[in-house]
Curated annotation (Swiss-Prot):
Transmembrane segments: none annotated. This is Small ribosomal subunit protein uS4c. It comes from Pinus thunbergii. The lineage of its organism: Eukaryota, Viridiplantae, Streptophyta, Embryophyta, Tracheophyta. It is found in: Plastid, Chloroplast. Keywords: Chloroplast, Plastid, Ribonucleoprotein, Ribosomal protein, RNA-binding, rRNA-binding.
Amino acid sequence: MSRYRGPRLKIIRRLKTLPGLTSKRPKNRKDSMNRSSSRKISQYRIRLEEKQKLRFHYGLTERQLLKYVRIARRAKGSRVRSIAITEMRLDKSFSIGYGSTSGARQLVNHGHIRVNDHMVDIPSYPCKPQDVITIRDQQRLRAIIKKNIDLFQRDKLPNHLTFHSLQYKGFINQIIDSKWINLKINELLVVEYYSRQA
């Protein structure tokens, strides 16, 4: 299944707020709200909606999400969460401080991002502690990123990242702490949804 490129407000109406998908808010529709509240919601639908929240928030394909759930289930020692794995992707790490996830994904795809002085053009590249993320030295590219920095730097940076706006450089300090993840989701329901496949 490919990445979703359809109407985003349609998804927001169904799954509620997803900061990674869009910052727009749908208008209240009283008729549809009354109809939906009278329906009985099945356990399958509850699990499906939690899974879809995770998928649409991070812009993942079905295959990518299943892969992260499998990695999280196989991890030994401390419990590794699939949501923490997705937060450590290059497109997500780069987007914090530089712009939106979709914009970051495009910059990565076009080969504008370097990790530890090596060009990386895979948005799903897993970042690790001590990684240094920089951009190619292009004046036009820096102007675009400077504009994004002014827009997105109002929010406090998560503790797993350090960002130097003047040098256009980011550092991965550690694996992200769950309290910094701005998506409220019941991961157990996602694991239960995939229990027959993972």
